[in-house]
Amino acid sequence: MILETITIIIYSIALVLIFMYALAQLNLLFNYLAAKKKEENGPKFNFNNSEEIPFVTIQLPVFNELYVMDRLLDNIALMDYPKDKLEIQVLDDSTDETVATTKAHVDQLKAKGLDITHITRTNRQGFKAGALKEGLEIAKGEYVAIFDADFLPEPNWLKKTIPFFKDPEIGVVQTRWGHINRDYSTLTKIQAFALDAHFTLEQVGRSSKGHFINFNGTAGVWRKDCILDAGNWEGDTLTEDLDLSYRAQ
């Protein structure tokens, strides 16, 4: 009898929690639909006025990414942004031949006039967060864009994201992820669907009402001062992106 009562209580609590979660998701859906109807009419940077264009640093934290580094670097080199207002940091913590091949590729891009630097460390203290933190110490940009090695941003990515920072209240802009291998298998289709729901409904729904959102670790751009004001990157957590996001808010 006691066991039966306990089971019913646990089951009832689970149902209540599921119902509350469903209501929260429904609220995000309504927020998303409302936000979708609004036109983006906020202030924009004038990219025809060089004095108004802000300096941007792109950080590429990598670790043993030998098979995607050439693709990544060639893609980033195509970024459509004034070259005198852009620097690229390759934060290479690799322990294999990635270091040598990446350095050679970086040297080639640098010879073509790209402001790109290959940065290595004698230790991996703080892992990804540690690499981002050390790169930030010498970053020249007022804004810092971050991409993992398997991301391929469109050439106009910076021109579509940086203008949001004309609003001084904006500290970070997170963009949605695309999927190169969406149709590879049933599993990748499910993963792509889940990520699309997160970015489309959850992130937009939260942001539209001023609720907490989180930086997803890549494909986003930070105001440098926002990172510093929040206490900078911390390497003592497995989710440095979520940790910084909540401290910043």
Protein language model features and the residues they cover:
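N-terminal membrane-anchoring/stem segments of glycan-assembly enzymes
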Residues: 1-52, 203
